[in-house]
């Protein structure tokens, strides 16, 4: 049994019944009965004890509750001293109070269907007790004090675990009815117990050495004595008083039965009205149910139609999503291959020692070229060289003007659209005339100013430099790749797919690192060219007239390396092949070893490694492309030029169809990468170190962190989109 338990809270109906019964017992003219049965009580309330004590109640009915004890705390059993009938059946009592003998007026005690383990010994003090019902409990024995119940007439102990009766029960001479389980009895024997109450009492009297007398001889004196005690103030005899009392009790019980019958009639009337209301309610429910079924059927049809449309739309979305995922996957593969190729090219340029040798040779050659002869001075085409210098400076200036005009043109596009065509033509004519005047003036000024000639030569030298040109092309390619990677990342976020997000981030960081390295190499190469120019200026004859014009003319007339190699005997297709594979720095090696397409077709990757081509991927690619060119030449012999023929420089061949294009799909290429801040202008700035291309030039100025990845911005790099 748990030490702590929560009291069961009575229902609302039980609480109302308890209040009604308590009020009914307190009314004027109420009978001596207090009925608090079926109120779901876990203990008898204090008010019931007070009512019994103050109003001298004689009957207390507390059956069919949840009582676990008869006497709650702060209550005394003396408050029930006037009680004659105590009905406690159908509860959960485990024991009766030890001072139960204080209820000296008690005549009827009913504790049927409880959980009593034993009876208190003080029960022998209930000298007026006539009926004791302890049926269906857990009693194992009766106390010896039961023999002191001299007025007991009815005793019911069936439904218990009692196997022996106390011998003291023979002293109860008034016992008329004894109910027990004869089959379970040991003492008296079951045969005696099955013979009836008289046989049991005779057996007990014989065992106790007493003479048996029937109860009728002892019952009348007991009743007379009870009558005397109960009518002390009555002048009549005991028989009259007993008759009057019995008549009074009969009248009270008849009144109680009448009230009970009246309540029953009211209950039947209420049930009839309730049944009528339930019928009406059932009809309304049936009507409502039919309408509800119709509405549900309509809703089901509409829902099925909506679900069908929704499933069709979902299938369409899934197909579109799958198509976009395939497209993004293909784009990622293309970008990965291009990034791998860029990394291989960069590694190849780092490891190649021939580049350093060629740069040193080029530096020596530049110094040799800077020596000016008298013949070159006489054959100087002053006007043409000045025009070329002017054109070079003009192109540099135009590039800066175009960049400035590009930004202003985007901001003032609406205002310029409103201006008339006539004004535009007039302005253009004026600008052209001013430009022609400036050009003529600049040409005459270039012929006289050595500093401007030197600047033009420096610009042409940077433009003609092979290594600087390769770095510029790689920077432009990486800018394009970063732009496409940013578009791809934004596309993935809109599609809510994150499966390859980490791979895209790694590729972007690799490209950012490569871009920073190329920018440093570009700056370093420009510094080297300026140092060469400084050395040439220091070694030049200070009094030599038109020194920089002559150097500019030499550099302008100088043939490209690929054209020189072709004139020396290298095949045009082989030169174009190396340029296409970004392996121009191997041209001097191939020319030195006099390699041709036929020789390369007979070589292995190990032979190319011995020659100086250290990259394994490039070795296999060169051999594969050479084999494709020879196979095409066998089908069309006129494609292969004869050896020794001097081939005029032409544009490089188109790449074979087998080469997978590195550009992204057309659908992704035409999409404009808009600024993620203003969502209006095109993205123009690269943020380093993260590599995102997500902002225009106006919006990036106040930013300190990247809007996409929240990384700190270490450097901003402007890119120009080709129109």
From Swiss-Prot:
Q: What is the effect of changing residue 692 to A?
A: Abolishes ubiquitination of TSG101
Q: What is the effect of changing residue 694 to R?
A: In CMT2P; abolishes interaction with FUS
Listed InterPro entries: Leu-rich_rpt, Leu-rich_rpt_typical-subtyp, LRR_dom_sf, LRR_domain-containing, LRR_R13L4/SHOC2-like, SAM, SAM/pointed_sf, Znf_RING
Give the SAM domain ranges. 569-632
Q: How is it modified after translation?
A: Ubiquitination promoted by PHF23 leads to proteasomal degradation.
Please report the residue spans annotated as repeat (LRR): 30-51, 56-77, 82-103, 105-127, 128-149, 151-172
Task: Give residue numbers for sequence motif PTAP motif 1.
Answer: 649-652
Positions of the UniProt region annotated as Disordered: 282-314, 642-665
- Cite a GO CC annotation: cytoplasm
Cross-referenced SMART domains: LRR_BAC (SM00364), LRR_TYP (SM00369), SAM (SM00454)
Q: Which PROSITE patterns match?
A: LRR, SAM_DOMAIN, ZF_RING_2
Q: For this entry, list what GO says about its biological process.
A: autophagy; negative regulation of endocytosis; positive regulation of autophagosome assembly; positive regulation of xenophagy; protein autoubiquitination; protein catabolic process; protein polyubiquitination; ubiquitin-dependent endocytosis
The primary site where this protein sits is cytoplasm
Q: Where in the cell is it found?
A: Cytoplasm
Catalysed reactions, as listed in the record: S-ubiquitinyl-[E2 ubiquitin-conjugating enzyme]-L-cysteine + [acceptor protein]-L-lysine = [E2 ubiquitin-conjugating enzyme]-L-cysteine + N(6)-ubiquitinyl-[acceptor protein]-L-lysine
Q: Pfam families given for it?
A: LRR_14, SAM_2, zf-C3HC4_3
Modified residue annotations for Phosphoserine:
234, 604
What general EC class does the enzyme of this chain belong to?
transferase
What are the boundaries of the RING-type zinc fingers? 675-710
The record describes the protein's role as:
E3 ubiquitin-protein ligase that mediates monoubiquitination of TSG101 at multiple sites, leading to inactivate the ability of TSG101 to sort endocytic (EGF receptors) and exocytic (HIV-1 viral proteins) cargos. Bacterial recognition protein that defends the cytoplasm from invasive pathogens. Localizes to several intracellular bacterial pathogens and generates the bacteria-associated ubiquitin signal leading to autophagy-mediated intracellular bacteria degradation (xenophagy).
Describe the subunit structure. Answer: Interacts with TSG101. Interacts with PHF23. Interacts with FUS.
Pathological condition linked to this protein in its record = Charcot-Marie-Tooth disease, axonal, type 2P: An axonal form of Charcot-Marie-Tooth disease, a disorder of the peripheral nervous system, characterized by progressive weakness and atrophy, initially of the peroneal muscles and later of the distal muscles of the arms. Charcot-Marie-Tooth disease is classified in two main groups on the basis of electrophysiologic properties and histopathology: primary peripheral demyelinating neuropathies (designated CMT1 when they are dominantly inherited) and primary peripheral axonal neuropathies (CMT2).
Name under which the protein is recorded = E3 ubiquitin-protein ligase LRSAM1
Originating organism: Homo sapiens
The root-end lineage is: Eukaryota, Metazoa, Chordata, Craniata, Vertebrata
